[in-house]
Amino acid sequence: MKRILVALDSSPCAPLVLSAADKLAELTGARLVVFRAVTVPPDMPRDVLLVSDLRLEDILTRNARGDLERLTRDVPPARLEKLVASFATPWDGICTAARNEAVDLIVIGSHGYGVLDRVLGTTAGKVVNHADRNVLVVRAAL
């Protein structure tokens, strides 16, 4: 195993998922590609969506990348290959990033933050069903 895609969201479980992936990378000598998909939050006020000088997509992606930088602060540089933030539907963005980055494994948390996850099925479940490579699902402490 050479490369692991770690799919993180903004939930409180993200550090646990990152820690599990980092331990696996340490044991296998793999490097981490840390990923976050961002979308427009459903509760975002409509007037924010009408920002003219700044593209909302760019703002959200830049903020997500900053979050990834903070989350990965304690990961040894030798194991951290890159950070990727993408404006995409989470499950599709994760599967696409895994292909584009040619990773050997996807590591994802079992429960995300989204309300839609409870209605339409979890992001983790969709990744497991659609990914063309192995997926390790990290279960949050109950």
Predicted regions and their residues:
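Small/aliphatic-rich secondary-structure junction motif
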Residues: 2-51
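A short acidic, glycine-rich active-site loop
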Residues: 52-66
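Glycine-rich, Arg-bearing micro-motifs that act as flexible, cationic patches
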Residues: 105-126
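Structural beta-alpha unit
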Residues: 72-106
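Short secondary-structure boundary segments
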Residues: 36, 109-111, 139-140
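Short, acidic/small-residue loops that bind anionic groups at enzyme active sites
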Residues: 130-140
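Short, hinge-like loop/turn segments at secondary-structure boundaries
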Residues: 49-53, 100-101, 124-126
